[in-house]
């Protein structure tokens, strides 16, 4: 469920007409709903009631500080994967003891920043990383809390580019080697082993891969405890998907996921961390764009819009589907037309949809890309020297620009021309 609904013939974001925001901000832009963000966070938080837990929002999905602050005030921790994300979370008021640091390529500077500013734990991905964290911790005179990310070799049944739990993926250590790696971690004086980390992929639409991975984690927990390790925290990653299409194939609900976690891991008495990103932010955001031209081709019609692949890369990168709807509600029974919906970037890959049925549209009409709140603005670029588009947050009957559109001078003047030119 989200809070982008038609009312009186027009699309609203909570209690604000989307067209009103477009008239103020200009198109294209991202638009987020506070009510939807909070609803999705609380669905996850409530699903784990009865277990000691922390929901750490995976801020790589959408990292604007206004979104982070909204979720942190509701009780969320943060999962970060870079120094920039760590500093962004801190700037949004998130305390270090509610931030977990993931990622396969943590640098010494990133580790030093997190240890100096406070960190809940590092999710360690390799033995060389373990050595670096130990060295930096000893240099600073602190002890670094760590979990080790294990790779359970489970097929997440998702897009190959976002699968992370199979043996050929770059993430974690093979679960078969976990006991020797934990023994080595325990011997390093700058580290404190506190738990296990696992994350098998993104946009999962079944519970079975999660359950198989978590069963392996449960077995490993008991083995490591028998070896003398104090395993009291399990970071289960994220990955639960969202419905991008209107089909009946909806992913499991958070409450169903929570029940599975309880029956699979509840007997261990561990603190549980989960790292949802897409499920919290995905349906909480839309991208609004304007039709520039309607062009008739040899065998098809094109809707050329002012949003482009540099603004929303998912369709070009992942062949991802987004429901695209007119901001003015079409009349009941209106005849549909098939369009290829494309942007102005000079690549054929700048295509959002092919043969998509839409009501007849004209230049100047607004369209909204649903389920664009996750991996939208954060993956945008300035390709073709197109400025990053604004982000707007709605809260009830009010809205605010939370990232403005830079002007062309700002973008161009970042360049430095050498003296010899």
Where are each of the predicted segments found?
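Active-site-proximal loop/turn and secondary-structure-junction residues that shape catalytic pockets
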Residues: 61-63, 84-85, 105-106, 126-128, ...
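Short acidic, glycine/serine/threonine-rich loops at helix termini
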Residues: 67-68, 91, 111-116, 133-136, ...
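Short beta-strand segments
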Residues: 58, 145-151, 197-199, 235-237, ...
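Conserved beta-strand positions in the central sheet of alpha/beta enzyme cores
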Residues: 79-80, 123, 147, 197, ...
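Active-site loop/helix belt of alpha/beta enzymes
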Residues: 152-294, 358, 384-386, 395
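A charged N-terminal "starter" segment
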Residues: 1-145, 183, 187-192, 219-222, ...
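Charged (often Lys/Glu-rich) extended helix/loop segments that serve as interaction or gating elements
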Residues: 260, 269-421
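Glycine- and other small-residue-rich loops at beta-strand/loop junctions that grip anionic moieties
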Residues: 56-57, 78, 103, 122-125, ...
